[in-house]
Design a protein with these regions (language model features):
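C-terminal halves and exits of single transmembrane alpha-helices
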Residues: 75-98, 113
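Alpha-helical transmembrane segments
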Residues: 6-23, 111, 141-150
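Loop-to-helix transition at the N-terminal end of transmembrane alpha-helices
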Residues: 31-51, 69
């Protein structure tokens, strides 16, 4: 498999893991109070996304890191929009909850965040570059799948704190 294809698949895996892990972390606070959930989303999620962006960018093997940033940003936005539809529309049946101002703010911020991370951490990203390994895929993939399954169980069985 070509290195770029592996890197794109890695990005998809990381974004999948971050999205579902983030929703799992926010589920209970959000179910108690929407404003609490939104507040936590706007404070905790940037750190989680930043962690994932960093892991994607240090594994980018292209000459121009900016190209990797653009690709990563597009992947993150597309997966977030599709995953939001799956989570709010298909799993929860709550499309009205999806289209809130905070959602669109989140999409814009997520798109810009990759560029901000490159601007702030470019030297560190270039210094920490490392190859993609099967372990990289497995760890993020397992976390994402486990988070998704737990979240589905919580919602379908109406588990409360």
């Amino acid at each position: 498999m070509k290195e770029n294809t592996k890197w794109i698949l890695y990005n998809l895996t990381v974004v999948f893991a971050l999205y579902w892990t983030g929703n799992l972390l926010l589920w209970f606070p959000w179910s108690i109070n929407a404003n609490l959930g939104i507040g936590l989303m706007l404070t905790i999620m940037p750190f989680l996304w930043g962690f994932g962006i960093f892991h994607c960018l240090i594994r980018y093997k292209g000459e121009k890191v900016l190209t990797g940033v653009i690709i990563n940003s597009i992947i993150m936005l597309v997966i977030a929009v599709v995953s939001d539809y799956i989570f709010f529309g298909l799993i929860r049946g709550a499309m009205d909850d999806l289209y809130q101002p905070a959602t669109f703010y989140g999409y814009v911020f997520l798109t810009i965040m990759t560029f901000l991370e490159l601007l702030i951490l470019k030297k560190l990203i270039l210094k920490k570059r490392c190859p993609l390994t099967a372990k990289s895929f497995i760890s993020f993939g397992a976390i994402g799948l486990l988070s998704l399954l737990i979240l589905i169980a919580i919602i379908k069985f109406d588990i409360k704190i």
